[in-house]
UniProtKB/Swiss-Prot annotation:
Primary gene name: hemB
Its EC number(s): 4.2.1.24
Name by which UniProt lists this protein: Delta-aminolevulinic acid dehydratase
Function text: Catalyzes an early step in the biosynthesis of tetrapyrroles. Binds two molecules of 5-aminolevulinate per subunit, each at a distinct site, and catalyzes their condensation to form porphobilinogen.
Lineage of origin: Bacteria, Bacillati, Bacillota, Clostridia, Eubacteriales
Keyword Chaperone annotated: no
Subunit structure: Homooctamer.
Amino acid sequence: MIKRPRRLRTNEVLRKAVRETRLSTDSLIWPLFIVEGKNIKKEISSLPGQYHFSPDMVGKAIEAALKADVKSVLLFGLPKHKDEKGSEAYNENGVLQQGIREIKQRYPQMQVITDICMCEYTSHGHCGILEGERVDNDRTLPYLEKIALSHVMAGADMIAPSDMMDGRIYALRSTLDKNGFTDIPIMSYAVKYASSFYGPFREAA
């Protein structure tokens, strides 16, 4: 597989985000949680000052981000319908896909990164397809590919897989390249910390 570091040099926002260590708003990414419905801006009790937004209200968060000179957001979707295969995750009209389109149509300068996982979308809450009582790693990969492709086709600038499936990066990169999205970067979730911060996140997502 060809390595393409040029992906990280395609625009000024991205170049500033990945350059050598420098403390500035260029390096900040604001996580946003998109829920189904209309006219929703509901505070997340475990994360004071953070909110669930419906797609039609997410513009308020983007305007606040841009005012604070934050140029990147990381989107998480929270659908009402969940099933064993997390089908809303790759629905072209799903809640996250709606949120992506809303942001990119109104604020094209905002860099939109999307979380690639299934736990928010599956009825059992696991990050993949279950086979009995275990997650079937290899059966899950094609679903992650569909999720990533649906996000990028909706307008996402970058994807960030958090699913922990073996082989996912090769699968996602191959699918993006095969469909003409060779310039879409994949952001690593490689560094994670044992922390109490994960508890509040689980309520948010």
